[in-house]
């Protein structure tokens, strides 16, 4: 029997780590050395964006200090590494790298048959209220990159041009909400991922399931059915229920404690909803409904 490889393709700031930790605690899939190895993303860039792969290696990846960080990564090496992370008492291993949501459809189509030959691959993507999720991510970047001297190693900027860019952003946008609104006006795939495009790209795999964060924390039974493993409850997360700056301080989620630097007003939420109407429409066209929690302002 093949081990399970459970791949989660984003979206960040949607309780991805509590999702992975729940699957670990319930004896389904081990997280391996880390929940986010970013191996597939680095491999993708090595093949399709070699110049940026070198930049990513020099400024981020090689500084992570883990056993899986290899400059000459291959898909074969990824397979062997993930198999080595399967532990007794678990059905398989998970890869919850949020960068999986940034892989191109071409690359995903290329690796799908290779991975499915070696693993029983299950793919999820977890999505949260689009307006609130976008603010949490953009606010977190604003917080960590405009005050980069006081961050942990994972947020350190090692590129002088990038440092200047964020210094200029701080000068232009005095707080996180003003910067967030500027990004809503010209949405990038990184800050505002199109959920449907991510789902379509990963649908080349045989087993794919979109997880709505608010729904699964209310009732995980549909998730249990998809993975074929009983999940009776989800671990606590910072974003459910939504509490903005008053979210709980869960020890292993310290990066998310202060992701929301400010509380969004009703007017802010309405503006965000209008700006992201295209995302809601795409979701409705694909899935035939909008989660009621996403319309709460």
Mark where each language-model region is.
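Acidic-and-aromatic substrate-binding clefts and catalytic sites of carbohydrate-active enzymes
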Residues: 66-73, 100-106, 214-218
């Amino acid at each position: 029997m093949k081990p399970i490889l459970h791949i989660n393709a984003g979206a960040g700031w949607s309780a991805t780590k509590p999702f992975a930790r729940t699957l670990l605690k319930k004896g389904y899939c081990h997280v391996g050395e880390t929940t986010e190895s970013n191996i597939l993303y680095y491999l993708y860039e090595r093949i399709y964006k070699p110049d940026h792969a070198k930049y990513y290696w020099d400024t981020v990846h090689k500084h992570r200090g883990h056993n899986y960080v290899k400059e000459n990564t291959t898909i074969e090496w990824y397979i062997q590494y993930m198999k080595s992370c399967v532990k007794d008492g678990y059905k398989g291993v998970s890869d919850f790298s949020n960068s999986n949501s940034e892989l191109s459809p071409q690359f995903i189509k290329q690796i799908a048959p290779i991975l499915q030959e070696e693993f029983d691959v299950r793919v999820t993507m977890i999505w949260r209220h689009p307006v609130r999720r976008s603010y949490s991510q953009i606010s977190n970047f604003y917080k960590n990159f405009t005050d980069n001297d006081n961050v942990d190693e994972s947020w350190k900027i090692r590129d002088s041009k990038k440092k200047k860019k964020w210094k200029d952003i701080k000068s232009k946008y005095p707080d996180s909400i003003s910067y967030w609104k500027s990004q809503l006006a010209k949405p990038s795939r990184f800050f505002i991922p199109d959920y449907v495009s991510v789902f379509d790209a990963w649908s080349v795999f045989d087993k794919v399931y979109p997880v709505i964060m608010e729904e699964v924390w209310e009732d995980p039974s549909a998730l249990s059915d998809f993975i074929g493993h009983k999940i009776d409850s989800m671990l606590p997360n910072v974003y459910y229920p939504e509490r903005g700056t008053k979210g709980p301080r869960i020890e292993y989620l310290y990066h998310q404690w202060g992701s929301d630097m400010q509380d969004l007003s009703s007017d802010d939420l309405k503006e965000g909803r209008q700006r992201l109407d295209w995302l809601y429409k795409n979701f409705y066209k694909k899935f035939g409904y909008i989660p009621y929690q996403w319309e709460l302002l």
